[in-house]
């Protein structure tokens, strides 16, 4: 199984609302979409680059390569990109497995997970700002409990 199978466009269909309404105005919705983590990171080009660099490196690293045996790397990359896109507000659909289901038999150790995260962080640092990197890592961090299945 893959080490990390790592995401709904903010609605801009709201019409202007009453000043005391809880619903955002059209202008507020557009501003929210423009300010999404997805957009601040650089959108799909950045996400695709980071995911590709990370998976290429960890799938060929002797410490983690066993986790990628028999995995179709292009499909994995596509799935991880979709998941990150959705989680960051990019409007992509993610229809892949849950982290728990996709990693339950993989026997991923804490050391393997930490190596993956280190490579991912390095790639994020090369392609996005610290604020965005940290926001994304905070979103993804809870997945560790579903990915790490052995010590």
Spans of features found by a protein language model:
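Globin-like tetrapyrrole-binding proteins
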Residues: 14-151
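C-terminal motif of bacterial Sec signal peptides marking the signal peptidase cleavage site
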Residues: 9-11
């Amino acid at each position: 199984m893959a080490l990390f199978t790592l995401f709904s466009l903010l609605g801009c269909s709201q019409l202007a609302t009453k000043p005391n309404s809880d619903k955002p105005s059209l202008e507020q919705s557009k501003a929210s979409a423009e300010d999404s983590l997805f957009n601040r990171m650089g959108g799909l080009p950045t996400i695709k680059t980071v995911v590709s660099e990370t998976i290429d490196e960890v799938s060929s690293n002797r410490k983690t390569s066993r986790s990628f045996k028999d995995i179709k790397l292009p499909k994995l990359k596509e799935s991880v990109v979709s998941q990150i896109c959705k989680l960051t507000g990019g409007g992509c659909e993610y229809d892949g497995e849950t982290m728990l289901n996709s990693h339950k038999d993989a026997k991923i150790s804490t050391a393997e997970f930490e190596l993956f995260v280190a490579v991912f962080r390095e790639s994020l640092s090369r392609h996005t700002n610290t604020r965005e990197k940290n926001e994304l890592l905070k979103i993804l961090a809870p997945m560790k409990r579903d990915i790490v299945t052995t010590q």
